Protein backbone atom coordinates (compact mmCIF):
# COMPACT_ATOMS: atom_id res chain seq x y z
CA UNK A 1 0.00 0.00 0.00
CA UNK A 2 1.34 3.40 -0.86
CA UNK A 3 2.10 6.09 1.68
CA UNK A 4 -0.97 8.01 0.60
CA UNK A 5 -3.13 4.98 1.24
CA UNK A 6 -1.66 4.49 4.69
CA UNK A 7 -2.25 8.13 5.57
CA UNK A 8 -5.86 7.88 4.46
CA UNK A 9 -6.27 4.61 6.42
CA UNK A 10 -4.94 6.26 9.57
CA UNK A 11 -7.15 9.36 9.19
CA UNK A 12 -10.29 7.38 8.47
CA UNK A 13 -9.78 4.50 10.91
CA UNK A 14 -13.22 4.93 12.42
CA UNK A 15 -15.01 5.35 9.00
CA UNK A 16 -17.74 2.66 8.57
CA UNK A 17 -16.93 0.06 5.88
CA UNK A 18 -13.50 1.56 5.58
CA UNK A 19 -11.74 -1.57 4.35
CA UNK A 20 -14.24 -2.10 1.54
CA UNK A 21 -13.98 1.51 0.40
CA UNK A 22 -10.19 1.44 0.50
CA UNK A 23 -9.98 -1.67 -1.66
CA UNK A 24 -12.30 -0.02 -4.22
CA UNK A 25 -10.02 3.03 -4.39
CA UNK A 26 -6.94 0.84 -4.90
CA UNK A 27 -8.59 -0.96 -7.81
CA UNK A 28 -9.54 2.36 -9.49
CA UNK A 29 -5.97 3.61 -9.10
CA UNK A 30 -4.51 0.48 -10.68
CA UNK A 31 -6.91 0.70 -13.65
CA UNK A 32 -6.03 4.36 -14.23
CA UNK A 33 -2.29 3.59 -14.29
CA UNK A 34 -2.79 0.79 -16.82
CA UNK A 35 -4.88 2.92 -19.23
CA UNK A 36 -2.35 5.79 -19.08
CA UNK A 37 0.58 3.49 -19.87
CA UNK A 38 -1.35 2.01 -22.82
CA UNK A 39 -2.13 5.48 -24.30
CA UNK A 40 1.52 6.57 -23.99
CA UNK A 41 2.73 3.44 -25.82
CA UNK A 42 0.27 3.92 -28.74
CA UNK A 43 1.14 7.61 -29.13
CA UNK A 44 4.85 6.83 -29.26
CA UNK A 45 4.37 4.10 -31.86
CA UNK A 46 2.20 6.35 -34.15
CA UNK A 47 4.66 9.29 -33.96
CA UNK A 48 1.92 11.84 -33.17
CA UNK A 49 2.17 14.41 -30.40
CA UNK A 50 -0.14 14.28 -27.42
CA UNK A 51 -3.07 16.70 -27.22
CA UNK A 52 -1.28 18.96 -24.75
CA UNK A 53 1.27 19.78 -27.52
CA UNK A 54 -1.38 21.13 -29.99
CA UNK A 55 -1.04 24.72 -28.71
CA UNK A 56 2.40 25.14 -30.25
CA UNK A 57 1.23 23.48 -33.47
CA UNK A 58 -1.70 25.91 -33.87
CA UNK A 59 0.59 28.88 -33.24
CA UNK A 60 2.91 27.79 -36.03
CA UNK A 61 -0.03 27.34 -38.47
CA UNK A 62 -1.31 30.86 -37.72
CA UNK A 63 2.09 32.33 -38.44
CA UNK A 64 2.32 30.48 -41.76
CA UNK A 65 -1.17 31.65 -42.79
CA UNK A 66 -0.34 35.27 -41.96
CA UNK A 67 2.80 35.02 -44.08
CA UNK A 68 0.73 33.67 -46.99
CA UNK A 69 -1.79 36.52 -46.62
CA UNK A 70 0.97 39.13 -46.70
CA UNK A 71 2.38 37.58 -49.85
CA UNK A 72 -1.08 37.60 -51.53
CA UNK A 73 -1.57 41.27 -50.61
CA UNK A 74 1.80 42.15 -52.06
CA UNK A 75 0.86 40.28 -55.24
CA UNK A 76 -2.39 42.31 -55.51
CA UNK A 77 -0.46 45.56 -55.12
CA UNK A 78 2.01 44.70 -57.81
CA UNK A 79 2.20 47.04 -60.85
CA UNK A 80 0.70 44.34 -63.06
CA UNK A 81 -2.49 44.16 -60.97
CA UNK A 82 -2.83 47.89 -60.25
CA UNK A 83 -6.11 49.52 -61.38
CA UNK A 84 -5.70 52.45 -63.73
CA UNK A 85 -7.43 55.64 -62.51
CA UNK A 86 -10.31 57.18 -64.53
CA UNK A 87 -9.05 59.57 -67.13
CA UNK A 88 -9.68 63.15 -66.17
CA UNK A 89 -10.17 62.36 -62.48
CA UNK A 90 -8.56 64.61 -59.93
CA UNK A 91 -7.83 64.39 -56.26
CA UNK A 92 -10.19 65.73 -53.61
CA UNK A 93 -7.92 68.69 -52.92
CA UNK A 94 -7.99 69.83 -56.56
CA UNK A 95 -11.75 69.36 -57.11
CA UNK A 96 -13.01 72.33 -59.12
CA UNK A 97 -16.30 72.94 -57.34
CA UNK A 98 -16.50 76.49 -58.68
CA UNK A 99 -16.67 75.19 -62.25
CA UNK A 100 -19.79 73.13 -61.64
CA UNK A 101 -22.96 74.38 -63.33
CA UNK A 102 -25.95 74.63 -61.00
CA UNK A 103 -29.44 74.64 -62.45
CA UNK A 104 -32.27 76.37 -60.60
CA UNK A 105 -35.97 76.02 -61.22
CA UNK A 106 -37.43 78.71 -63.43
CA UNK A 107 -39.65 81.29 -61.78
CA UNK A 108 -43.31 81.37 -62.64
CA UNK A 109 -44.21 83.72 -65.52
CA UNK A 110 -44.99 87.26 -64.41
CA UNK A 111 -48.60 88.41 -64.68
CA UNK A 112 -49.83 91.97 -64.19
CA UNK A 113 -52.95 91.06 -62.23
CA UNK A 114 -54.75 87.98 -60.98
CA UNK A 115 -58.48 88.20 -60.31
CA UNK A 116 -60.44 85.78 -58.17
CA UNK A 117 -63.69 85.70 -56.26
CA UNK A 118 -63.59 85.20 -52.48
CA UNK A 119 -66.89 84.95 -50.59
CA UNK A 120 -68.72 86.57 -53.49
CA UNK A 121 -66.30 89.52 -53.62
CA UNK A 122 -63.88 90.26 -56.43
CA UNK A 123 -60.26 90.27 -55.25
CA UNK A 124 -57.49 91.55 -57.54
CA UNK A 125 -53.81 90.92 -56.82
CA UNK A 126 -51.44 93.30 -58.63
CA UNK A 127 -47.90 92.14 -59.33
CA UNK A 128 -45.16 94.75 -59.22
CA UNK A 129 -42.73 94.84 -62.17
CA UNK A 130 -39.72 92.64 -61.64
CA UNK A 131 -36.31 94.02 -60.80
CA UNK A 132 -37.49 97.28 -59.20
CA UNK A 133 -35.42 99.14 -56.66
CA UNK A 134 -37.13 100.16 -53.39
CA UNK A 135 -37.57 103.70 -54.74
CA UNK A 136 -39.06 102.49 -58.02
CA UNK A 137 -41.40 100.14 -56.14
CA UNK A 138 -42.62 103.08 -54.04
CA UNK A 139 -43.23 105.13 -57.20
CA UNK A 140 -45.17 102.25 -58.77
CA UNK A 141 -47.33 101.92 -55.64
CA UNK A 142 -48.04 105.67 -55.64
CA UNK A 143 -49.05 105.50 -59.30
CA UNK A 144 -51.55 102.71 -58.58
CA UNK A 145 -53.01 104.64 -55.64
CA UNK A 146 -53.33 107.78 -57.78
CA UNK A 147 -55.14 105.78 -60.45
CA UNK A 148 -57.54 104.38 -57.85
CA UNK A 149 -58.30 107.89 -56.58
CA UNK A 150 -58.91 109.05 -60.14
CA UNK A 151 -61.35 106.20 -60.75
CA UNK A 152 -63.74 107.83 -58.28
CA UNK A 153 -64.34 110.66 -60.77
CA UNK A 154 -63.51 109.12 -64.15
CA UNK A 155 -64.86 105.90 -65.60
CA UNK A 156 -61.69 104.04 -66.46
CA UNK A 157 -63.62 101.01 -67.74
CA UNK A 158 -64.65 102.91 -70.89
CA UNK A 159 -61.37 104.78 -71.32
CA UNK A 160 -58.90 104.34 -74.15
CA UNK A 161 -55.26 103.52 -73.41
CA UNK A 162 -52.41 104.71 -75.64
CA UNK A 163 -48.81 103.69 -75.12
CA UNK A 164 -46.30 106.53 -75.04
CA UNK A 165 -42.55 106.59 -74.65
CA UNK A 166 -42.99 108.32 -71.29
CA UNK A 167 -45.78 106.12 -69.97
CA UNK A 168 -49.50 105.61 -70.64
CA UNK A 169 -52.14 107.97 -71.97
CA UNK A 170 -55.70 107.26 -70.81
CA UNK A 171 -58.52 109.05 -72.63
CA UNK A 172 -62.14 108.81 -71.54
CA UNK A 173 -64.91 109.63 -74.01
CA UNK A 174 -67.77 111.31 -72.22
CA UNK A 175 -71.38 110.43 -73.00
CA UNK A 176 -74.04 113.04 -73.66
CA UNK A 177 -75.82 112.28 -70.36
CA UNK A 178 -73.74 113.08 -67.30
CA UNK A 179 -73.96 110.95 -64.21
CA UNK A 180 -75.00 112.49 -60.94
CA UNK A 181 -71.62 111.52 -59.51
CA UNK A 182 -69.60 113.24 -62.25
CA UNK A 183 -67.54 116.22 -61.03
CA UNK A 184 -68.36 119.71 -62.37
CA UNK A 185 -64.96 119.88 -64.04
CA UNK A 186 -65.97 117.27 -66.62
CA UNK A 187 -68.38 119.55 -68.44
CA UNK A 188 -65.58 122.03 -69.16
CA UNK A 189 -63.49 119.35 -70.87
CA UNK A 190 -60.21 120.60 -69.49
CA UNK A 191 -57.26 118.21 -69.88
CA UNK A 192 -55.94 116.92 -66.58
CA UNK A 193 -52.40 115.67 -66.03
CA UNK A 194 -51.86 113.60 -62.89
CA UNK A 195 -48.82 112.13 -61.25
CA UNK A 196 -48.30 110.08 -58.13
CA UNK A 197 -47.58 113.34 -56.24
CA UNK A 198 -50.83 115.00 -57.37
CA UNK A 199 -53.65 112.57 -56.63
CA UNK A 200 -56.48 114.97 -55.72
CA UNK A 201 -56.51 118.15 -57.87
CA UNK A 202 -59.02 120.90 -57.19
CA UNK A 203 -62.16 120.58 -59.23
CA UNK A 204 -64.85 123.25 -59.61
CA UNK A 205 -66.94 125.02 -62.25
CA UNK A 206 -64.42 127.85 -62.61
CA UNK A 207 -61.23 126.17 -61.48
CA UNK A 208 -58.35 125.36 -63.73
CA UNK A 209 -55.88 122.56 -63.15
CA UNK A 210 -52.74 123.69 -61.45
CA UNK A 211 -49.33 123.22 -62.92
CA UNK A 212 -48.72 119.46 -63.01
CA UNK A 213 -45.87 117.82 -61.21
CA UNK A 214 -43.68 115.98 -63.68
CA UNK A 215 -42.94 112.35 -62.86
CA UNK A 216 -39.81 110.49 -63.94
CA UNK A 217 -39.81 109.83 -67.72
CA UNK A 218 -40.63 106.12 -67.36
CA UNK A 219 -43.44 106.70 -64.85
CA UNK A 220 -45.46 109.57 -66.36
CA UNK A 221 -49.20 108.93 -66.53
CA UNK A 222 -51.34 111.28 -68.66
CA UNK A 223 -55.10 111.26 -68.40
CA UNK A 224 -57.35 113.44 -70.53
CA UNK A 225 -61.08 114.01 -70.62
CA UNK A 226 -62.26 114.58 -74.19
CA UNK A 227 -65.90 114.85 -75.18
CA UNK A 228 -67.44 112.55 -77.69
CA UNK A 229 -69.03 114.02 -80.80
CA UNK A 230 -72.26 115.65 -79.60
CA UNK A 231 -75.52 114.63 -81.20
CA UNK A 232 -77.84 117.22 -82.72
CA UNK A 233 -80.35 116.68 -79.91
CA UNK A 234 -77.83 117.34 -77.19
CA UNK A 235 -76.49 120.40 -79.06
CA UNK A 236 -79.91 121.96 -79.41
CA UNK A 237 -80.87 121.26 -75.83
CA UNK A 238 -77.57 122.56 -74.49
CA UNK A 239 -77.79 125.76 -76.52
CA UNK A 240 -81.14 126.56 -74.92
CA UNK A 241 -79.67 126.43 -71.43
CA UNK A 242 -78.03 129.60 -70.09
CA UNK A 243 -75.24 127.49 -68.52
CA UNK A 244 -74.76 125.28 -71.61
CA UNK A 245 -75.63 122.20 -69.54
CA UNK A 246 -76.78 119.04 -71.34
CA UNK A 247 -80.34 117.87 -71.04
CA UNK A 248 -81.04 115.67 -68.03
CA UNK A 249 -82.99 112.64 -69.13
CA UNK A 250 -85.61 111.06 -66.90
CA UNK A 251 -84.54 107.95 -64.95
CA UNK A 252 -84.75 104.63 -66.72
CA UNK A 253 -87.23 101.90 -65.93
CA UNK A 254 -84.68 99.48 -64.50
CA UNK A 255 -87.40 97.09 -63.34
CA UNK A 256 -88.21 96.22 -66.94
CA UNK A 257 -84.67 96.56 -68.28
CA UNK A 258 -83.21 94.19 -65.68
CA UNK A 259 -85.44 91.30 -66.76
CA UNK A 260 -85.04 91.85 -70.50
CA UNK A 261 -82.55 89.61 -72.28
CA UNK A 262 -79.53 91.28 -73.86
CA UNK A 263 -76.80 89.96 -76.14
CA UNK A 264 -73.09 90.76 -76.52
CA UNK A 265 -71.35 90.47 -79.88
CA UNK A 266 -68.06 88.49 -79.92
CA UNK A 267 -64.78 90.25 -80.64
CA UNK A 268 -63.79 87.65 -83.23
CA UNK A 269 -66.95 88.17 -85.24
CA UNK A 270 -67.60 84.50 -85.95
CA UNK A 271 -68.36 83.19 -82.46
CA UNK A 272 -71.71 82.86 -80.70
CA UNK A 273 -73.26 85.76 -78.83
CA UNK A 274 -73.39 85.95 -75.06
CA UNK A 275 -76.96 86.31 -73.78
CA UNK A 276 -78.28 87.04 -70.31
CA UNK A 277 -80.18 89.47 -68.12
CA UNK A 278 -79.04 92.00 -65.53
CA UNK A 279 -81.18 90.32 -62.89
CA UNK A 280 -79.39 87.03 -63.54
CA UNK A 281 -75.96 88.67 -63.29
CA UNK A 282 -76.80 90.39 -60.00
CA UNK A 283 -78.39 87.25 -58.59
CA UNK A 284 -81.89 88.70 -58.28
CA UNK A 285 -84.04 91.57 -59.53
CA UNK A 286 -83.93 93.23 -56.10
CA UNK A 287 -80.11 93.33 -56.13
CA UNK A 288 -80.07 94.86 -59.61
CA UNK A 289 -82.61 97.55 -58.64
CA UNK A 290 -80.72 98.32 -55.44
CA UNK A 291 -77.53 98.96 -57.41
CA UNK A 292 -79.35 101.05 -60.05
CA UNK A 293 -81.09 103.22 -57.43
CA UNK A 294 -77.74 104.05 -55.83
CA UNK A 295 -76.98 106.50 -58.67
CA UNK A 296 -77.73 107.06 -62.31
CA UNK A 297 -75.62 104.39 -64.06
CA UNK A 298 -75.76 103.62 -67.74
CA UNK A 299 -76.75 100.26 -69.14
CA UNK A 300 -73.10 99.46 -69.78
CA UNK A 301 -72.22 100.34 -66.19
CA UNK A 302 -74.93 98.00 -64.99
CA UNK A 303 -73.58 95.25 -67.25
CA UNK A 304 -70.01 95.65 -65.98
CA UNK A 305 -71.17 95.74 -62.36
CA UNK A 306 -73.26 92.61 -62.89
CA UNK A 307 -70.37 90.75 -64.53
CA UNK A 308 -68.12 91.67 -61.63
CA UNK A 309 -70.77 90.58 -59.13
CA UNK A 310 -71.01 87.19 -60.86
CA UNK A 311 -67.20 86.94 -61.09
CA UNK A 312 -66.97 86.54 -64.90
CA UNK A 313 -66.00 90.07 -65.93
CA UNK A 314 -62.43 89.19 -66.86
CA UNK A 315 -63.60 86.18 -68.88
CA UNK A 316 -66.27 88.11 -70.81
CA UNK A 317 -64.30 91.28 -71.56
CA UNK A 318 -61.63 89.41 -73.54
CA UNK A 319 -64.21 87.67 -75.73
CA UNK A 320 -67.12 90.11 -76.23
CA UNK A 321 -67.87 93.78 -76.75
CA UNK A 322 -69.27 95.20 -73.52
CA UNK A 323 -72.13 96.99 -75.28
CA UNK A 324 -75.43 95.26 -74.44
CA UNK A 325 -77.89 94.93 -77.33
CA UNK A 326 -81.60 94.59 -76.57
CA UNK A 327 -84.01 93.22 -79.15
UniProtKB/Swiss-Prot annotation:
Cysteine disulfide links: none
List the subcellular locations.
Virion; Host cytoplasm
Question: Region (Interaction with the Nucleoprotein-RNA and template-binding): which ranges?
Answer: 302-322
Residue stretches of biased makeup (Acidic residues): 62-78
> Which Gene Ontology cellular component terms are annotated?
host cell cytoplasm; virion component
Residues the record lists as Phosphotyrosine modifications: 15
* Keywords, ordered alphabetically: Chaperone, Host cytoplasm, Phosphoprotein, Viral RNA replication, Virion
Q: Which domain of life is it from?
A: Viruses
Keyword hit for Glycoprotein: no
Region (Disordered) location: 28-96, 192-246
Asked whether the UniProt record includes Transmembrane among its keywords, one would answer no
Q: Where is the composition biased (Low complexity)?
A: 202-212, 226-242
> Which residues fall in a compositionally biased region of kind Polar residues?
34-49
Specify residue ranges for compositional bias: Basic and acidic residues. Answer: 87-96
- InterPro entries per record: Phosphoprotein_C_viral (IPR043036)
List residue numbers at the site (Involved in oligomerization). Answer: 140
Q: Which family does it belong to?
A: Belongs to the vesiculovirus protein P family.
Q: What does this protein do?
A: Nonenzymatic cofactor regulating the function and conformation of the RNA polymerase and part of the transcription and replication complex. Binds the viral ribonucleocapsid and positions the L polymerase on the template. Acts as a chaperone for newly synthesized free N protein, so-called N(0). Plays a role in virion assembly.
Summary of subunit composition and partner proteins: Homodimer. Interacts with the L polymerase; the association of P and L forms the polymerase complex and positions P optimally for encapsidation of newly synthesized genomes with the nucleoprotein. Interacts (via N-terminus) with N(0). Interacts (via C-terminus) with N in ribonucleocapsid (via C-terminus); this interaction allows to package the L polymerase in the virion and positions the polymerase on the template, since P acts as a bridge between N and L.
Name under which the protein is recorded:
Phosphoprotein
Organism of this sequence: Piry virus (PIRYV)
Which lineage ranks, top first, belong to the organism behind this chain?
Viruses, Riboviria, Orthornavirae, Negarnaviricota, Haploviricotina
